[in-house]
Regions:
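Membrane-embedded alpha-helical bundles that constitute the cytochrome b-like, heme-associated redox core
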Residues: 1-184
Length: 184
């Protein structure tokens, strides 16, 4: 197996979760600017549902990461760069869990269930609007922190691709070519 790359399931988790997180962020920003009504409610409901899916996928992704080793960091990266990359990934994982879990807590504490169109999950929590508002504020701050860390992650990937030209981005691509300087 090519240990310079992530395996296909890890790559699939990465890109599906990236798309869902992008949708969750964009949908709520768009919904906040929409007039009240059925379409706005649909967008907000889909935001909540996507958050729940992210929680499930993250749990599966972590389980997969525990049984499937990640490829080693490229030897061209300094020890400091490797530490920073590991810290950034740890932060991403923490925030990918924290943001949707806080969002679900906000929803449930409002007394609302989770709607998936063809089924729903009732709130397991007693309504507490004041606590819901407080948790929503933390949810929003954590979401902005997640987006900032995602921006850093993307900037680092682009730096590797276009400045260092070390082929690091191929580690997370479905392409069969190996990162520069590494053999399959």
């Amino acid at each position: 197996m090519d240990r310079a790359r992530y395996d296909r399931l890890a790559i699939l988790f990465h890109w599906v979760m990236a798309a869902l997180i992008f949708y969750a962020a964009a949908s709520i920003l768009i919904a906040d600017d929409l007039p009240r009504g059925a379409f706005r409610d649909l967008i907000k409901t889909s935001h909540d549902s996507v958050g729940a899916v992210v929680v499930v996928l993250l749990a599966l992704r972590i389980l997969w990461r525990l049984v499937s080793r990640a490829p080693a960091m490229p030897s061209a990266m300094t020890a400091q760069q490797q530490r920073l990359a590991k810290l950034a990934h740890l932060g991403l994982y923490a925030l990918m869990a924290m943001v949707p879990l806080l969002g679900l807590a906000t929803l449930f504490l409002r007394g609302r269930g989770l709607e998936f169109g063809f089924f729903s999950i009732a709130s397991p929590l007693a309504a507490n609007r004041a606590l819901s508002r407080s948790i929503k504020e933390v949810h929003e701050l954590a979401a902005y922190a997640l987006l900032a860390l995602v921006a850093f992650h993307v900037a680092a990937a682009l730096w590797h691709q276009f400045i260092k030209r070390d082929g690091l981005m191929r580690r997370m691509s479905f392409s069969r070519s190996s990162p520069a300087g590494q053999t399959p």
